[in-house]
Amino acid sequence: LICDGFHINPAVLRITFRILGEDRTVVVSDSMRAAGQPDGDYDLGGQMVQVRGGHALLPDGTIAGSTTNLHEELKNLISFGIPFRQAVKSVTINPAREAGAADRVGSLAPGKLADAVVLDAATYDIRFVLMNGSVVYRA
């Protein structure tokens, strides 16, 4: 599921999360190379893409991809009314399991990589990021 609030209507996401349940929802970013870039026109691999208001569109108005990331999508899910635990699982252990990588990533457990993003409990902003147990980013 792409949970940028553009690809899929938030009401449809709420229904989907309710039907699929806590362990079957998987969120992906579908981010393209224009992700994080300001509004403008971009040539991405010979394809013209217009970024307007954070949305990537082809010149005919077709969605060209997403300009969001999983952190933004997690915050979106919470704002759409998805329970926190279900939202977190949809961007961590569930995709890791579907990719066959749950033995290494997706949750914190002995023997797994110590990768984690620590969020502010009130705002869900990133406080710091751990990769393999080392802090690689601190807000």
Predicted segment positions?
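Conserved protein kinase catalytic core
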Residues: G36, I126, R138
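Short, Lys/Arg- and Gly-enriched loop/turn segments at beta-strand edges
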Residues: T123-V129
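Short alpha-helical
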Residues: H7-I8, Y124
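His/Asp/Glu-enriched, well-ordered alpha-helical/loop segment
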Residues: L1-G5, V12, T16-L119
